[in-house]
Regions:
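Short glycine-/small-residue-rich flexible loop motifs, especially phosphate/cofactor-binding loops
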Residues: 4, 75, 238-239
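Cysteine-centered nucleophilic/redox motifs
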Residues: 63-89, 108, 202
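Residues at alpha-helix termini
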Residues: 9, 80, 243-244
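Short active-site-adjacent helix-start/loop capping segments
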Residues: 44-47, 76, 95-96
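Generic C-terminus detector
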Residues: 229-250
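His-Asp-centered catalytic microenvironments across diverse enzyme cores
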Residues: 1-10, 14, 34-35, 91-98, ...
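Secondary-structure boundary elements
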Residues: 1-62
């Protein structure tokens, strides 16, 4: 495992001395370079919680992954560069107003002069680290985010188009180890109730928007413009996978 190869993978150049400016740039470059994807689950390849395996997949094979892989690997890079990083357990907000079980999502806490929420593994979410500050909303790529304490947890929310704070996930600040996520990682890739087993998904931030591909459709956003087109068969899916993500499994 080599930090310089990782930096090359995310096309990062410049200082790596721990600071909020460097953290912001690393975060954005990671999102622009490494997709969120669950393709291994549908290829019958088990996802094992091991940082060297994450590194090989993301850096050497130029793939992506889901939260445990992406944030687990990014945590390794940040520590190699001298950042103080903790893995946190998060519970994803559901449509019914509740939250999923513990360890359903992994997010990161980076401590500089102030504590920052870092997450390169939650798909379409914030692009820059968020200050753990419950007193004011934080603007990010035209979206407002808020981090607020609720009982014993902290909740990340986004200002919705209907004019309410919509929770994304809740988390505690207790540091966790990679193996703590083992049971939930197994569930995510094997349970028929897991949304990761229901369909293939790959999504990546672009300089002006996002590209998202599933078994059923491809969605392209560019600024205020959004287009959605059906995916009719596996051959078309494979072609789009190569065109937009430079991946092929032939």
């Amino acid at each position: 495992m080599d930090a310089q190869s990782y930096l090359k993978r995310i096309v990062y150049r410049g200082s790596v001395r721990p600071s909020i400016d460097v953290l912001r740039r690393l975060h954005v470059r990671h999102l622009l370079s490494v997709p969120f994807e669950n393709l291994d689950i549908h290829l019958g390849r088990p996802i094992i919680l091991d940082q060297e395996l994450f590194y090989n997949k993301i850096v050497r094979d130029r793939r992506g992954g889901y939260c445990y892989e992406l944030n687990g690997c990014f945590a390794w890079l940040l520590r190699e560069l001298g950042f103080r990083v903790s893995m946190l357990s998060a519970r994803v907000a559901g449509k019914n107003g509740g939250f999923s079980p513990d360890f359903d999502h992994m997010t990161l806490l980076v401590r500089l002069e102030e504590p920052w929420l870092v997450d390169v593994g939650f798909g379409d979410s914030f692009t820059e680290p968020k200050l753990l500050d419950s007193t004011r909303p934080q603007l990010d790529s035209g979206e407002l985010y808020r981090i607020a304490r609720k009982n014993r947890e902290t909740v990340l929310s986004r200002w919705d188009e209907i004019g309410v704070w919509a929770p994304l996930y809740s988390f505690t600040l207790r540091p966790r180890k990679l193996e703590d996520f083992k049971a939930r990682n197994r569930y995510q890739q094997t349970s028929p109730k897991s949304h990761f087993t229901k369909r293939r998904l790959i999504s990546k931030l672009t300089p002006n928007g996002r590209v998202t591909l599933t078994d059923r459709k491809i969605i392209l956003t560019n600024g205020e413009q959004r287009s959605e087109s059906p995916v009719r068969n596996s051959k078309q899916f494979d072609g789009l996978l190569t065109k937009y993500f430079h991946l092929s499994f032939e």
